[in-house]
Amino acid sequence: MAAMARNPNTRSRDMFLSMAVIVVPVLLLVWFFSSPGEEKPQRVDVAAQLKRATVEAPYPLLVAEGLGSEWVPVRAAWALEGQPWITGEPAEANSWQVGYLSPDEVYFGLQQRDGAEVAFVRSATREGHAVGGEVEAAGRSWERYESKDGRTRSLVSGGEADTAVVAADADFVALEAFAATLTEVAPQA
């Protein structure tokens, strides 16, 4: 029987076609599921929320000043007691919150409200406990707190009209430096 003539390039061509059938879908899956790059945090307009809050607030509001352009304001919210809060639930008290991302991308948050101090402090400090030591910043006395897992540190200031909590996953030195930038903005009459 005569041997059939074979094209010597057929085996190579078939191998390349088989590889393409396998590699192309894998590359498409990798491309589809890979992240498109780092997203920059969305800046929020703290001044707009602060303006509204100072008209409605029954207590002086704290806001950071002079942080520098590397700090990004990423949260600003105000709600009167009973109005929708950022959680979608009614605010339990007159509530002010502002948060910034540091140049190291650590979130530094300030929460301030009147009423229900114990539950508020427990929530804002991630169920933290006092660790001793007081700090003076923004014309207030602040007590140091640390969360149960030791990750989050907080400064708590209980005033006559309100309670304020500054919290971050940072050491107390950085937290106190942030608290030193806070200034009180009086409510408008």
Which residues does each predicted region cover?
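Generic hydrophobic secondary-structure signal
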Residues: 15-32, 67, 89, 98-100, ...
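Short, solvent-exposed recognition patches
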Residues: 46-148
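A short, solvent-exposed beta-edge/loop patch
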Residues: 131-189
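Residue-identity detector for threonine
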Residues: 10, 54, 87, 125, ...
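Charge-rich, low-complexity N-terminal segments
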Residues: 1-79
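Generic surface-pattern signal
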Residues: 33, 55-59, 126, 180, ...
